[in-house]
A protein has these predicted regions:
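Serine-dependent carboxylesterase/thioesterase catalytic core
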Residues: 39-52, 56, 62-146
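Flexible, membrane-associating and regulatory peripheral segments of lipid-active enzymes
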Residues: 1-41, 51-54, 59, 64, ...
């Protein structure tokens, strides 16, 4: 799994802060989201962020009726096998407990993790939702083709 470019890595904290600040503007619209069907969702944070940074989205998903969980791997310190393996362990645990496929929601680098996990564990994953993830969009390597 290849990580984001150095430019994207360096600008991630700033981009995350901007995203969080726009949440305040979006709050009135969020009440129009229809209720979920109760399936499990695992949320994966972006680079240099931890599960604490995903609490707002997990709380929102829970309020909408989903079973939202954290990735439980601490701070996302980049592309590392131990973080990937740990996230897969949590995914397997959620699947075993619920008997349902799990949706993966990843913010920035977390979206790259989510996509890679889904590619390697498709029998456990319902869908992937990536938020601001730095995917390549040129030619056959485009995210729509992987």
């Amino acid at each position: 799994m290849q990580g984001p470019s150095n430019l994207l890595r360096l600008t991630e904290p700033l981009r995350a802060a901007v995203d969080l600040s726009t949440l305040t503007l979006a709050m009135p619209w969020l009440r129009f989201f229809k209720a979920g069907d109760g399936h499990p969702v695992m949320v994966i944070p972006g680079f240099t962020a931890s599960g604490r940074s995903t609490k707002i989205i997990r709380d929102f998903l829970t309020a909408r009726g989903y079973q939202a969980s954290c990735w439980e791997q601490g701070t996302n310190m980049g592309v590392r096998g131990d973080l990937y393996d740990g996230a897969v362990d949590i995914l397997e645990k959620i699947h075993a407990e619920t008997g349902l496929k799990v949706s993966l929601v990843g913010q920035s680098l977390g979206g790259i993790y989510a996509r890679e996990i889904a590619k390697r564990q498709p029998h456990l994953v319902r869908q992937v939702i990536s938020l601001g993830s730095p995917f390549n969009t040129i030619g056959s390597r485009s995210s729509k083709n992987t």
